């Protein structure tokens, strides 16, 4: 029961913010990896595109874009809007200062598509904070399928705890519903609703 789970978590000093409510189901989704046609991509005069596979590209900017002193989420989002094909379909996931990269995941059905080689943008910059290249892959022909029952957030936390994936004193800062890959078929991919838990 919820009360029992809550008291176990309290004993273990595992804290969490307000949990998402009213999410009882979400659809499975099928989609296809986009096959690129280089002629449809934006800014051909300032970006040199290269197909790394038929479903992913590398885009090298002829003139690197300076981000000034700091690489910020705001500047990265503006860069995506301005330079990246379908940039508004991607959301920032992480900035890695050490590797000088920022990774964006594709938004599908208003939720993030987690760690999928067919749904991401990776932006690269040099030691002067100038963006010189990005990688791009995306899914298209997105079709919602049958609904899947969603496990309640509190039960997910309990499951993580019982599998020793949550340590005593852990603080859950965020929980969101997204999508992860369930099945890869020759003609399409199948995605399932998945909880993202940030600790």
Explain the meaning of each model-derived region:
Residues 117-149:
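Short, structured interface segments that constitute the first stable element of a domain
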Residues 138-192:
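Intrinsically disordered, low-complexity segments enriched in Gly and acidic/Ser/Thr residues
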Residues 1-94, 101-103, 108-112:
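Preferential activation on post-signal-peptide N-terminal prodomains/segments
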Residues 82-127, 176-199:
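Exposed beta-strand-loop-beta-strand "reactive/processing" segments of non-cytosolic proteins
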